[in-house]
Every structure is written in C-alpha cells, then in structure tokens.
C-alpha cells in the first residue's frame, strides 16, 4: 500500500490551527498536527484497498436461503465536511448455486468501502454492487443507519438524527415477502 504523506497533512493542520487563531506550538497542540496525520492514515486506509478481494475465496455450501449479518459497526468521513459519520450496516444475500462467503468478509467489505472520504449512499450501493458482482447471488440487500457529525455539530445541529440508506438488488427487489423477512430479522434481537 502506498503510504500517505503524513508530513504534508501535519503541515496543513498546522496552517489550519494558525488560520483559526490558535498557536500550534503551544502545549496541548504541539503534537496535534502529526496526531491528525496518523489518524487520517487510519481512517482513510480503505483508499488503497480493493474491497472486492474479500470475495476471492468462495465456499461451496448447499445453502441457498437467506444469509444476514446485521449490526456491523462502521465509521467513515463525510467527504463534504471531513467529519465522521458512524453507525451500523445490515448485509443480507440469497446465495445461488451454493456460493457463500465467509461471514467476516461481509464486515471487511463494509470496512474497506467506509474507510475513505465517502457518502453513506455510495457505501450502501458499492457494498451491494461488489457482492452482486463477486458472489453472483440471487439477490443482495444492504441497509445502513448512521449518525452524521455534519448534521450534529454544525449546520442544523440535530444530535441523534439517523440517516438510513438501502440498496436492494436481484430477488429482494421484487419479492415483498423476502424484503419483509430481512427487515423483521434486523429488528429482532
């Protein structure tokens, strides 16, 4: 993986601190620029990753009924304001021809797609499209719920507001009963 330019980020953070009237050399802020650079390296780690590789290994298992991994915690950075948004993803698919993925792979794909400057809508769609392309299932349904700091700490200032997005593909798109089953299982503890 190509490394990010941490020094360039640290220099930019120092400029931002000066621009808002802070002294970046004072105690408490002296190490902040490099801390922010290391944080960006971590939260943007998905930029240099291909999330689809998690589905390079597929298992042949004669299971052709619903698979749901719910409450996958994720965090990302709003590409409009560079502030976090975070929540849970629920990923369901209907295997075809016995092709199933390791359960952890669904969470890894969500992580890799999320760890970059991003929009929730794009994460939702991208996860669904990768699964359709690599797993070749009968259908995929991805639902994401997140709180966006760009709505919580600025602008409309509405803490606790949740945004819910969905991507529905294949069998889930036209089968109300199948969609309802996923929604009921998500609500079920």
UniProtKB/Swiss-Prot annotation:
Q: Name one GO cellular component term.
A: cytoplasm
Which Pfam families does the entry mention? GTP_cyclohydroI (PF01227)
UniProt keyword annotations, A-Z: GTP-binding, Hydrolase, Metal-binding, Nucleotide-binding, One-carbon metabolism, Zinc
Q: Which GO terms label this protein's molecular function in UniProt?
A: GTP binding; GTP cyclohydrolase I activity; zinc ion binding
Give me the reactions it catalyses.
GTP + H2O = 7,8-dihydroneopterin 3'-triphosphate + formate + H(+)
Query: PANTHER family from the entry?
Result: GTP CYCLOHYDROLASE 1, GTP CYCLOHYDROLASE I
Assembly, in brief, is: Homomer.
Q: What is this protein called?
A: GTP cyclohydrolase 1
Q: Which organism is it from?
A: Listeria monocytogenes serotype 4a (strain HCC23)
Name of the coding gene: folE
């Amino acid at each position: 993986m190509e490394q990010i330019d941490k020094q360039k980020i640290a220099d930019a953070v120092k400029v931002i601190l000066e621009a808002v009237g802070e002294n970046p050399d004072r105690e408490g802020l002296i190490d902040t620029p490099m801390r922010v650079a290391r944080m960006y390296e971590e939260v943007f780690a998905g930029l240099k990753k291909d999330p689809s590789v998690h589905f390079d290994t597929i298992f042949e298992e004669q299971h052709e009924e619903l698979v749901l991994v719910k409450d996958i915690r994720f965090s990302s950075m709003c590409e409009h304001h560079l502030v976090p948004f975070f929540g849970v993803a629920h990923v369901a698919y209907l295997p075809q021809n016995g092709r199933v993925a390791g359960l952890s792979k669904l969470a890894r794909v969500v992580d890799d797609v999320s760890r970059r400057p991003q929009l929730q809508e794009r994460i939702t769609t991208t996860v669904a499209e990768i699964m359709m392309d690599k797993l070749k299932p009968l259908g995929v349904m991805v639902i994401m719920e997140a709180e966006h700091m760009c709505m919580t700490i600025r602008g409309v200032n509405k803490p606790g507001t949740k945004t819910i997005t969905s991507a529905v593909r294949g069998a889930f798109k036209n089968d109300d009963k199948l969609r309802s089953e996923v929604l009921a299982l998500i609500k079920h503890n």
